[in-house]
Amino acid sequence: MAHKKGQGSSRNGRDSNAQRRGVKKFGGEAVIAGNILVRQVGTKFHPGAGVGMGNDYTLFALVDGKVRFDREGRRVNIDVA
């Protein structure tokens, strides 16, 4: 037998906000310097030419141009040219 009554509603009611990660600019899109290309944890995507990486692995455009995704084996690089 239960020694406590159901604690349903008093223990529920928490939910965290989504972290909004993912690709923000897709292949072929025009970007300007400073635009965020990808928000990620770890290097799922690697920075290529014209792309910088922040402390939290965010990839951003260093130059104006078009986004290009490039595969080298398992490694996916993002270039802006």
Swiss-Prot record:
Key word Ribonucleoprotein present: yes
Biological process per Gene Ontology, one example term: translation
GO CC annotations, alphabetized: cytosolic large ribosomal subunit
Disordered, as annotated region: 1-22
InterPro entries noted in UniProt: Ribosomal_bL27
Tagged with keyword Ribonucleoprotein: yes
Coiled-coil intervals: none
Pfam families listed in its UniProt record: Ribosomal_L27 (PF01016)
MF terms in GO: structural constituent of ribosome
Transmembrane segments: none
UniProtKB keywords: Ribonucleoprotein, Ribosomal protein
Domain of life: Bacteria
Similarity comment: family membership: Belongs to the bacterial ribosomal protein bL27 family.
Database matches in HAMAP family: Ribosomal_bL27 (MF_00539)
Protein's recorded name: Large ribosomal subunit protein bL27
